[in-house]
Structure formats: C-alpha cells, structure tokens
Amino acid sequence: MVDYSPGERRSQWDRFGNKVSLLVVLLLLTTTVKAWASDQIVVPERIRAVVAAPDRSEADRALDPGRHPAEMLAFFQVSPGLRVAELGAGGGYTTELLTRTVGPNGVVFAQNNRLILERFAEKPWSDRLAKPVMRQVVRVDREFDDPLPPEAHDLDAVFIVLLYHDTVWMKVDRSKMNRAVFQALRPGGIYAVVDHSAPPGAGLDDVQTLHRIEEKTLKQEIEQAGFELAGEADFLRNAADTRDWNDSPTAAGERRGTSDRFVLKFVKPSGANPKPPAH
C-alpha cells in the first residue's frame, strides 16, 4: 500500500472529484439529449384510444405504421379542448386524428389551397368532412400565403405535415405564411412541422423532384418568423434511407412511409408581440 503524504492525498482526492464532476456533467448531457430527441415519448391512453377507434377507415389504418400517429399526437401535446389548425390538410388523414383528439370542445381549422383541391383532394376531402366525427372541423379554402381566417386566432397549435416542401415548388411566400402562423398562435403555442429529409447541403434543390427539404433550411426559415425550436423527435427517423428517391405518395410505392423524416416542435415565445403578415 502506498503511503501518500496529506498533500498528495488531497491532490488525489481533487483529481477524483474532478472526474466525478465530469461524469455527472456527461450524464446530465446524455439525459438532456435523450429528452431533446424525445426517443421515449409517453403516449396517454386517451391518444391510444383515438388511434384504435374502430370507426377509423381501413385506408387510414394502413398508413399508421409509417406515420406513427400516437407518437405524433403525444409529442405535440394534443389534448381535448384545444384550438388547432392544419395547413395543407389534403384528404384529411391528420385532420381526423386531430379532431378526434381535441374532441367536442375543441376545434380544427383545416386548410387546403386551390391546387391541392383541384389536383388531388376535393373528392376524398369532401367525403371525409361528411363523417359525423368531423363536425368540429372548419373547412378553410385559402392560399398558403394567407392560410387562416380571422376567427383562427389564439390557437394552441398549427400543423403542417409532410407538406412544407411542397410550398416551395408552389411558389408560396413562405416568409408571409410563417408570420401568419405566428400571428394566429397564442403565446406558447406550437408550430408542428413534419417533413421528408433531404441530404445536408441540398437546401431546396429536391423539393419537387424528390419531395424532400433539408432540415437546416426549414429551421432557418421558420425561426426567421420569430419561432423558437423547442424540441425534436426521432420516431420517424430512418438512418438507412439513402434520401435519393422520390417519396411522394404516388411515386414511393412500397417504400411509402419509410423515408427519413424530421419532427420539429417550434414555439411562439411567451410574451412575443404579434408579427402580422407582410403586405
């Protein structure tokens, strides 16, 4: 046994203490990263019941494995009584999940523009809106530059799911769109964004050919409107995705639902002044 002097023992203890402190810091950082990545999302039973509802269509259920609706609703904190909106609702897969979750005391403003309705969605959208479960949905036919009506204010959340990239090739003024969303949300309200990931450096190059957008570019655009990034989730990530194929619903075929997708939670800061859309 080595007999250290008091000074040497103190030095040894200091080094040990430094190592312990470093270990604690690393553990805290690891915990923070896990919370930020949201790889352990707790799904409330009420949300599981929404997804498992027996009157949901078989077509919607077939999309569930590739969309993880329970995790999405839980991550974005959708609950009964909320006022929410969806931009680019399309045929209404996400809209129906939202209205089932917010329930009879909530409301969902569901927007489509003319192009989406005329080319893809009018028939399935109208058919879905006729279902009794959709009675809390307000149909909104407006362009993306000014997507929400005046009555859509103090919203708890606004969703745009797998569609932000389309607003690029549709020549939408995205700066104006994002400011309109900012204005419609209450302080602390959530801008919920899900989209297909393009490789680093791609920027906006793949928005029409591959229906993908670079995550960094999208973050920059939304943060410029005044939003703060409050969280990310990885339940739609796929590291095996080569990100060089077209993942649009009509082109993806059997690969639909397997693309690498980012899930981002932006928040309107509490006390933020409204930022009206530019005219």
Give residue ranges: language-model regions:
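A short acidic, Gly/Pro-enriched loop at the edge of an enzyme's catalytic core
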Residues: 148-158
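A conserved beta-strand element that flanks and buttresses the S-adenosyl-L-methionine
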Residues: 159-163
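A short glycine-rich, Lys/Arg-flanked "PGG" loop and its adjoining helix->strand segment in the class I
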Residues: 99-100, 174-187
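Conserved class I S-adenosyl-L-methionine
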Residues: 81-90
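Class I SAM-dependent methyltransferase Rossmann-like catalytic core
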Residues: 47-75, 79
